[in-house]
Amino acid sequence: MRTLPLNGSRNSSRLPTLLLAAGLAMTPWAPALAAGMEGMDHGSHSMPMGASSDAPAQSRTPIPPVTDADRAAVYTSHSGHQVHDSAINSYFVADKLEWQDANDGSALAWDLSGWIGGDIDRLLLRSEGERTNGKTEEAEVQALWGHAVSSSWDVVAGARQDFKPGAPQTWAAFGLQGQAISDLDVEATAFIGDAGQTAARLEADYDLLLTNDLILQPTGELNFYGKNDPQRGNGSGLSTSEFGLRLRYEITPQFAPYVGVTWNRSYGKTADYAREDDEDVAQARLVVGLRLWF
């Protein structure tokens, strides 16, 4: 038989391809290779249509520059005072302006205070007293310098002038005032008077919010003296105490009528002086009054 050469036939160009396909089909790993090709995700190889579409769009509204007014607003306190404010401010309150039903007649009592100055240093003014049946029984005025030592406490120093009882008397005063806890106001003041007389006073009051407008206020005051003073009816040690409970209704924050009751008591030699003058050692009083501030 005569054999034709491979390059001499018309189909000679297809023979290498057929032989390669037959050889691959006969290999043992051909099925695994085919399965692997079928499991490939050919769609993941597609190129994104527009890469620039994924970038965030830039705002067409320009951001305005920060102004001095913007910077100042950052440091503005909600209470109306600037940080380290040097402006002069003031506050005055008639904490007690009341009529009292005393055992020996009706009485008018007051407890006023206020300040004027800056956030750190202030002039403090205080006054309290009582008139019974048209006669002044007690009256005093204090003028103090106050210096803030923290956000809640001030040290105070100045002078106190007594007009009644007895002859007028002048005291040097120094102490602390502030808030021990929220809404608990405390004043602790020591006094040095004429002829080596000394005294101390501790006052506290607390505002208990019953509703937005109804407030119950317990109060307390203790007075101490270093030595006996028969002319003014003050004995050494714990001299007098006064505790009160007042319920006020705030028609506005600046105007609040109230009703309440107080308990007054004298101790030791002070009580002895009261008995000698036919005065009560202890008594309870019904009170009606107004609380004002501006």
Swiss-Prot record:
Q: Which GO terms describe its biological process?
A: intracellular copper ion homeostasis
One GO cellular component assignment for this chain's record is:
cell outer membrane
In residue numbers, the region (Disordered) covers 40-60
Per the record, membrane topology reads: Peripheral membrane protein
Highest taxon, organism lineage: Bacteria
In the record, what terms sit under GO molecular function? copper ion binding
Cite the entry's keywords alphabetically.
Answer: Cell outer membrane, Copper, Membrane, Signal
Pfam families, sorted: CopB
Residues of the signal sequence?
A: 1-34
Q: Where is this protein localized, as stated in its record? A: Cell outer membrane
The protein's job, in short, is: Exact function not known. Could be involved in copper resistance.
| Protein name as annotated | Copper resistance protein B homolog
Task: Name the gene for this chain.
Answer: copB
